[in-house]
Amino acid sequence: GTYTFDIKENVPQTQAGGMTYDAHTTKVTVNVVRDTEDFAKLKASVSYNSVTAGIATDKATFENSYSSSTEAEGGTSAEVKVNKILNGRPLKAGEFQFKLATRPTNGSNGTVIQEKQNQENGNISFDSLKYKTSNTAAGDTAIILSQAVRDGYAEKSPDQNGNTVYTLKYRIYEEAAEGTLPNGVSAVTNFYDFTVTVTDNGNG
């Protein structure tokens, strides 16, 4: 006789954070016939068909994926706090330009990812740095961590608890090229290097 079964993943009611479950169904057809050489024996053949994709396969395969983001519930983005000091006269809003750039570990020039001006109180408000592990994770403007590793300004390593840790290196500097500073102002050529540590605790 012929017997058919449906196989699908049992998705838990409380889903694991960051996990995307495989929702497809595979139909299994079992055909049982008598052995032509030994009538007392039965022989079974099995075929599989992915109902969702309409594709015949040699087995039932289910593939889940995991991704995480600082934009997911419980995640935190990196706030970058910078302040400009001008000696000799009051500071005006928008007088000075500042750049936030990646800092590759090989010493090569990084890529400028943000440009901001000072406020009247001297604060420079860079946008928060947000991160995710894949394109499908939350956060349209988040930096993809695997790409940061390939670009050379991030390193990936495990911590003592087995969590994945990314260490990203950045530099903030003031635009002090000729013609970019107000009259009578001379720059103290300074840049500030900092790192951001992102820990993926396995919960998205």
Kindly give the residue locations of the regions a language model identified.
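Solvent-exposed loop/turn and edge beta-strand elements of beta-rich ligand-binding domains
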Residues: G1-G204
